[in-house]
UniProtKB/Swiss-Prot annotation:
Ubiquitin-like modifier which can be covalently attached via an isopeptide bond to lysine residues of substrate proteins as a monomer or a lysine-linked polymer. The so-called ufmylation, requires the UFM1-activating E1 enzyme UBA5, the UFM1-conjugating E2 enzyme UFC1, and the UFM1-ligase E3 enzyme UFL1. Ufmylation is involved in various processes, such as ribosome recycling, response to DNA damage, transcription or reticulophagy (also called ER-phagy) induced in response to endoplasmic reticulum stress. This is Ubiquitin-fold modifier 1. Residues 84-85 form a propeptide. UFM1 precursor is cleaved by UFSP1, promoting its maturation: processing of the C-terminal Ser-Cys dipeptide is required to expose its C-terminal conserved Gly residue. There is a cross-link at residue 83 (Glycyl lysine isopeptide (Gly-Lys) (interchain with K-? in acceptor proteins)). Belongs to the UFM1 family.
């Protein structure tokens, strides 16, 4: 089984820290979101992953699908930043 890698940046931190995660293509993207949130010590239940263009990603798909549709560079945003003006 092949793997895909994502560079996930935490946008709520002014230093823009990032983590590179490699997971099997068939991994549910919800698991990637949960793991990334835990790595950054933010609550997974209130976080979202978006593309660098600001497009939200539906986590109900495989990591392989997300990689093919959106590429490897993604951003993690805690919900206190989602939809706020």
């Amino acid at each position: 089984m092949s793997k895909v890698s994502f560079k996930i940046t935490l946008t709520s931190d002014p230093r823009l820290p990032y983590k590179v995660l490699s997971v099997p293509e068939s991994t549910p993207f919800t698991a990637v979101l949960k793991f990334a949130a835990e790595e950054f010590k933010v609550p997974a239940a209130t976080s979202a992953i978006i593309t660098n263009d600001g497009i939200g990603i539906n986590p109900a798909q495989t990591a392989g699908n997300v990689f093919l549709k959106h590429g490897s560079e993604l951003r993690l945003i805690p919900r206190d930043r989602v939809g706020s003006c």
